[in-house]
Each structure stands twice: as structure tokens, then as C-alpha cells.
């Protein structure tokens, strides 16, 4: 029995190939290093090429065209891909340290409406706009930025407040306070492939590993 188990493990270790993974910056920073490390311990001969998209639709296009074998994106997917939902990423309000309402739980709606607001660039802010609409808030948008790290730095420097998915604000390199909105809103993150029936073995192994890893670690 042991020899059979060992033979299977040897075969597993021999698995090789190249997987092209498309992602967006918060997943690339928060999840991918840990996912790739744990996957590499199981399959040391599978290589990766990372593509970071500025917009979700760019990631979808890469998967459709075959430039990427799989990709992280938010639901709903518009291009008829095979998707595996992974994680409900809760939206959070971020404010500078020392903000007078930093300790409020939940954060007051009227403050969101009156303070200078730093908005994530359109195209990636669908859930944020929907959440503001549902709260009946029309924020005073003073700045619009494309990069989540830029927004974190601006909030940290007291230029305004923002509403961003938790994965973007988790482990912020800049000091900020993360606050709970008056209601819960989410961005749904998934991993997608063009056709789950036509995956290379190495891509299938990686997608399965991602699903397991996020189920175990996604909420930490």
C-alpha cells in the first residue's frame, strides 16, 4: 500500500506545465503569493505566468482570447465563462487615523454624504456605486483614482474617506481605520475559465487548489 501511495505522490510531483493566471491587484497582493506557495509545494514543476488586469473586463477578455488560462474576476461575468464563486468580499469604509467618527459602529451615513470622498475609477466601482445608491448617499467626490493603493495613501493623508472591498484595505501599507458601513454590501469574487471541459491538467489542478485554499483561508 505504501509503495502505491508513494508512486502516486511521485506522479503528482512530476506534473508539469505552464498556467497563465490573470488577476486584479488586491487578489494578486493578498491571496496569490500564499496560493502559489502552497500549490508549489504540491506541484513543484508547474510554472506560472501572472497577468494583472487594470479592469475586470480586461481579465475576462484575456480568458476568452486564451491569453490567460484562468482568471480571478468579480461576478457577474459578462462573457459566458465557466465561473467558480470563491468569496464574498465585504465593502468597508476607510477613514484617516484620528477621524472623529473612526470609532462609530456602524459608520454614520450622513458622514459618508458630507465628507470629501475618494472614488475608485468607474468600471471597477459597480458594487460601490450600488451600495451608495442603496444607502441613498450621493457622496461629495473630490478625487477619483484608479489604484486601490493610491486611495489608501490619500485617505491615510487625510484627503478624504472611501468605500472599498475588504481585500483592498486588508494589510494596508498606510495607517487607516477600517469601519463598518450601516449595512453589509459585498463584491463577489470568482475564478473563471473559458471552458471547464477543455482545461489542461495543470490549470485544472490549480483551479481546484484555489477553490480549496479560499474556502479555508479566504476569510482570515
Which positions does each model-derived feature cover?
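A late-sequence structural motif
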Residues: 31, 177-220
Amino acid at each position: 500500500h505504501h509503495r502505491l501511495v508513494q508512486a502516486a505522490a511521485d506522479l503528482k510531483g512530476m506534473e508539469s506545465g505552464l498556467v497563465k493566471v490573470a488577476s486584479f491587484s488586491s487578489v494578486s497582493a493578498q491571496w496569490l503569493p500564499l496560493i502559489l506557495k502552497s500549490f508549489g509545494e504540491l506541484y513543484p514543476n508547474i510554472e506560472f505566468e501572472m497577468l494583472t488586469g487594470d479592469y475586470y473586463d480586461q481579465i475576462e477578455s484575456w480568458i476568452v482570447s486564451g491569453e490567460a488560462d484562468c482568471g480571478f474576476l468579480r461576478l457577474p461575468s459578462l462573457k459566458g465563462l465557466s465561473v467558480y464563486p470563491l468569496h464574498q468580499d465585504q465593502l468597508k469604509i476607510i477613514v484617516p487615523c484620528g477621524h472623529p467618527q473612526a470609532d462609530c459602529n456602524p459608520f454614520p451615513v450622513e458622514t459618508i454624504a458630507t465628507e470629501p470622498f475618494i472614488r475608485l475609477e468607474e468600471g471597477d466601482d459597480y458594487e460601490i456605486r450600488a451600495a451608495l445608491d442603496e444607502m441613498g448617499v450621493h457622496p461629495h467626490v473630490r478625487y477619483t483614482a484608479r489604484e486601490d493603493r493610491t486611495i489608501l495613501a490619500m485617505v491615510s493623508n487625510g484627503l478624504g474617506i472611501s468605500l472599498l472591498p475588504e481585500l483592498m484595505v486588508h494589510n494596508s501599507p498606510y495607517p487607516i481605520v477600517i469601519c463598518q458601513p450601516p449595512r453589509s454590501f459585498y463584491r463577489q469574487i470568482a475564478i473563471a475559465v473559458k471552458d471547464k471541459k477543455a482545461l489542461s491538467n495543470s490549470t485544472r489542478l490549480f483551479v481546484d487548489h484555489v477553490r480549496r485554499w479560499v474556502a479555508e483561508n479566504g476569510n482570515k
